[in-house]
Amino acid sequence: MNTPKRNILFLLIFLLLFAGSSIYLFKDKINRLFFEPNVPSAGGSVSFEEGASVKDNKPIEIIAENLKIPWEIAFLPDKDVLVTERPGTILRVGTDRKIYHIEGVESSGERGLMGLVLHPNFEQNKLIYLYFTTDTNGTLRNKIERYRLEKDNLYDKTVIIDNIPGSIYHDGGRIEFGPDGMLYITTGDAGQPHLAQNKNSLAGKILRIEDDGSIPEDNPYKNAVWTYGHRNSQGLVWDNQGRLWATEHGRSGAQSGLDELNLIEKGKNYGWPTIQGDETRTEMETPVINSGPNYTWAPADIEFINGSLFFSGLRGEALYEAKINDLVTPERISSAPEIKIHFLKEFGRLRATRLSPDGYLYITTSNTDGRGEPKSGDDKLIRIDPEIFANR
C-alpha cells in the first residue's frame, strides 16, 4: 500500500475510534445526568462526609414491605404505626394489619394522600389529621380533613382547611403540630411559581392554623400564611431550642440542585422564585444551607435527633445529617454545618423520616413512585437504631 492510502486508512481508523469513545462519553454523561443519583462534587455550599451504612452491623429492621408509595408515619399510643400511602390508604402496622380507605383522593403524579399527624391530645380526643389532593370538575385542590380514630375505625370527618391550590407537581403536604399547639402545613407552588410571592394565596407557603382550622390572632398576615416564598417544602421539625426547620425542594430537571434547609421565622419571605441558593435580595431569606448547583438531595422529610437534623433524599437516595447544635446561636446560625451522608444508594429513594417515642428512627422508601428502581419488597418501612450514627 502506498503512503497516501496508508495515511488515509490510519486517519479513518483514528476518526472511528475517536467517534466511538465520544459517543460512549456522551452516553455516560447523559446517564449520569438523568438516571443516576447525584454524588457529592466539588463546589456548592456544603462539605460532605461518609456516614452510616447497612454494613455497620447495627440494628436495622424491615417492619413492613410491599407498601404503595408510603408518604408519612405516625405512632399510636399502643405502639402501632400508621403509614399513609399516596393512592389513598392508611396502613396500620402492629398486632393487626389494617387498611383505612380515604374517599376522594386524587393520586396521580406527586399528588395524593400525603401528610398525617395525631392531635397533641390524641389519647383523650382520638383525633387525626390528613392532607390530601382532590379533583372537583377538573380543578385540583389540597385540603386537610380531621377524623376520630376510635374502635379501629375512622369517624366524624371534618374539613379543617381547603382550597389549597393543587397540581400534578409541587403539592407540599407535610403537617405538624408545633410546641405552641398550632397546626403547621407546607404547601407547594402548584407549578405556578408566582403564587409563592402572593400572600393572599395558600400556595408556596408554610401555613399556621388552630386545631379547628381557625386563624390564630398572632399570625402575621391575618390569614393562614406563616411564611411565604416557598417552592415545595415537604419537611418540618422543631429542634431542642424550639426553632422550626424546613426542607425545600430546589429546581427540577437537568439543572436540578439548590435544595434548601431553612430556619423558619414568622412572616419571613424565603425568596422563591426571585432568589434561590446563595442569591440574596433585600427582605428575602437565604437558606442556612443549600445543596449547591451540582448536587441534588430532593429533601422530603426531616427529623431532629441528638443535636442533628436528619433529612431524607429522594433523588439523592440517602439520609443526610446536618449537626446544628454547635453552630446555632440563640437567634441565628454561625456557619454552615457539615453534611454526613448515610445509606447512600442502599435503600434507594427515601421519604418519611420519623423518631418513635421509644427512640427508634423509622424511614420509608419511595421506589414505587415512578421515579425509582423498585427492588424486591418495595416499598418498605424500616426501623433503625440511632446508635448507628454515633461516632461516624
Language model features: what each stretch is:
Residues 62-68, 100-108, 161-167, 224-229, ...:
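Surface loop/turn motifs at the tips and blade-to-blade linkers of beta-strand repeat domains
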Residues 96-120:
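Blade-loop segments of beta-propeller domains
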Residues 61-88, 297-303:
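Beta-strand-rich domains and repeat architectures in extracellular enzymes and scaffolds
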Residues 82-85, 130-131, 184-186, 246-247, ...:
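Residue position within the beta-strands of beta-propeller blades
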Residues 1-16:
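N-terminal Sec-pathway targeting helices
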Residues 141-177:
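Asp-box/WD-like beta-propeller blade repeats and closely related beta-sheet repeat scaffolds
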Residues 29-53, 111-113, 121-123, 190-348, ...:
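Beta-propeller domain segments
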Residues 74, 117, 176, 237, ...:
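Conserved beta-strand position repeated across blades of beta-propeller domains
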